Amino acid sequence: MAVSRRELIAYGTAGALTALATGRNTIAEGPLQDSSAPSPMPAQVASDRVPNLSASRNSSYDIRNDLKPRRLTMAMWDQAYVMRHMPGGSYENYDRVLDETVERGYNTVRIDPMPQFIDLGKPDRELRWADPRQPFMPWGANKAVNGPAGLWIIDFIEKLHKRSSLYYTLSGWWSMPGPPGSPRVPELLRKPTNMMEGAEIWATLLTDWKKRFGFDRIVYVDVANEMPYFFPEFVDRLKKATGVGFDDLSSLSAAQISFLADEINKAMGLLRRDFPELRFTTSIHGDLRWLDVPLELDCLDVHFYADADPRWTERTRFNEFIGDKLFQTDRWFAEFSERSKKTAAAVAPMLRSRQRFKMAEFADWALRRGTPLTTSESWSTWYYIDDPKLDWGWLLDWAKWSVDDAIDYKFWGWTPHNYVQPQFANWTDAKWHRTLNDRFLNS
């Protein structure tokens, strides 16, 4: 049994770490092959494809010219804007954080309104999250949270609305209660058993959202973050229905394609019917196998990470390290940092080149499907944190070149990395953020 990234991030590693001993091998290029470094989490598939030489790339119409804003500079805030709003937290002062966001050139924040927990009809309901016991968790909660989370969200959105340059996307991470022994989370309003039920839960929240705030500043709604990994029990249901796991094949089977399209498109259809004024999507990894799935999305949010390239994971030992008490220990930080620096020095141009090919393929797919392309978290390692043992230089270099790549492939939305939150040291360098954001906004 492999432990999914959704499980680890949603409710932590407590109670789940025993499964790491039998991780799933990373899927490499071409036919399935063994790896000396088993991955305890789903990794992006690194398989190659025959390039799509469709005429769509020659289209003179640029969808972004008819969208508002014309470019999105995106900051991924997940649940941290609520979970770190406690006294002493990095989001304690919403006015200060929002002003700093504008100062750094961001115009779109990506937030999880937690529809499984939050009832905006009863916003003063006290919600309690136990201490996650994860001292090396970069996002979300880093200590116990107690308070009227619904009121905090209302306060946050009302203050965001006072800043005319700011927009937001809503994104569902669908954190759930963990196995026995996991830190306690609030009582669920409802647990979805399929994507359609997830859409119904979203519809309840969005109805209340419209009454309180309207929809003017919502860019789009990401119904489920990084399908299929974060939506409750989806991976297990897909395997049961199709006889094969999502990460088991280098190309999706016909049964898998049918299952994914049916689940996702029906949920999107329900929400489009009830809220025709909103855009809906589900975010995905930069996994080229998605190009075979006929999804009907209004926007396409793709997350491109280095673990899609075995040349990076083999050199850095990333898949091994994240299987060693992720969020709970720093004992492998120094080696991971040193390996990452050496890898960047040796093959950064090669890694960038392959990542650009993936961007080109998704850009073409987005054009053919009629969807603007964004990335709200991406590029190098999806796990890093401020620590004396971890050097950020190589990661920030990757972020710098990513803006030119996003411009080349006509991305609507871009982010430099998935650490654009006020608790990170990089946040204090306002000029660094502003320079990159201005470059993208003026492209």
Regions found by a protein language model. Give the residues of each.
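N-terminal export signals
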Residues: 7-27
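N-terminal carbohydrate-binding accessory modules
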Residues: 41-108
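Active-site groove signature of glycoside hydrolases
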Residues: 170-179, 203-254
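Aromatic-lined carbohydrate-recognition surfaces of secreted/lumenal glycan-active proteins
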Residues: 220-225, 261-289, 372-376, 416
